[in-house]
Amino acid sequence: LSRCYPWYLPGCQRHKASSHSLFRRQTPFPEVKKISGRVAVLSGLSGHIYYHWLFDVLPRFRVLYKALKAEGRSLKDIDYFVVNSVEKPFQRETLQRLGIPLEKVIESDRTPHFQAEELVVPSFAGPLDWVPPGSMDFLRKAFLDRAYLQRDQNLAETAETFGKRIYISRANAKYRHVLNEAAVVELLDRFGFVTVALETLSVAQQARVFAEAE
């Protein structure tokens, strides 16, 4: 339910819960904030990073939804949702797509120590960096829904701009750059590839571009 680095691979027998960084904390916790109502915790390790937000945090909504449905309840029965942050556009956009009002969101980055009247903590959908098929299906249904992608003319124009062959550039990334990217782009250009900087596109635009690519 609470992950920390370095994390272990599935089936690892050497992992000990006592090694969690929480138990090695030297500084005192901030003052506890008491929250009334039913609070669902969905934040995850490195949830501020696009990949971990998409494949670790968002699939917890599926786990939560299924658990609530089994009890005859729905997401509307949750008063607050705890996620890492809603600072970045992709976080706000994806939550909106899942029907989560931002006014019901608590950012764990800003409120790391709280006590809820009732706490709901769904498990992670799968091991860290090992995305289960159910999570992939959930994300596809949420963000590759044909009606959702076709209702916005801007999305269609975005896909047409980039075409069928795309190269994802990391030129603007903070880490893991392609050292000879200029040469790679020049080579791929001969084969009709168009360079895409994903950080300049919305999640919906990204989904449309990938859906239309070869």
PLM features: residue spans?
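The feature primarily captures lumenal catalytic ectodomains
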Residues: 1-214
